[in-house]
């Protein structure tokens, strides 16, 4: 039921009032590189939103080095509750991929994310 999902998300995000940030929008290892002058990111799908959205995508691509989180935390620490909000921010991408690309693994991942949000399995 979409109304139940929307209510759950609203409840979970009610006390989270992040400052809007310019987001990459498609952050994963295929859009990052390390060059002679340092790291580069490219192929953005930029928008303004919660900075946690970009970081929530990283676990969906396990090839990302864990140092990304360490570096991010050293510059701009994440507020408490990030891991609780992560499935909410992953849900859009998973549903979008399931619709666009199909495949049982994507449909299963999208269903698991929905279950995590609806069943309050969040950390």
Swiss-Prot record:
Gene Ontology terms for molecular function = kinase activity
- Which EC class does it fall in? transferase
* Catalytic site positions: 26
Residue ranges annotated as coiled coil are: none
Looking up SUPFAM superfamilies in the UniProt record yields: Protein kinase-like (PK-like)
Q: Keywords in alphabetical order, please.
A: Kinase, Transferase
EC no. given is 2.7.1.-
| InterPro entries linked | Fructo-/Ketosamine-3-kinase (IPR016477), Kinase-like_dom_sf (IPR011009)
Q: What does this protein do?
A: Ketoamine kinase that phosphorylates ketoamines on the third carbon of the sugar moiety to generate ketoamine 3-phosphate.
Which protein family is named in the record?
Answer: Belongs to the fructosamine kinase family.
Which PANTHER family does the record associate with it?
Answer: FRUCTOSAMINE 3 KINASE-RELATED PROTEIN, PROTEIN-RIBULOSAMINE 3-KINASE
> What is the protein name stated in its UniProt record?
Probable ketoamine kinase in tonB 3'region
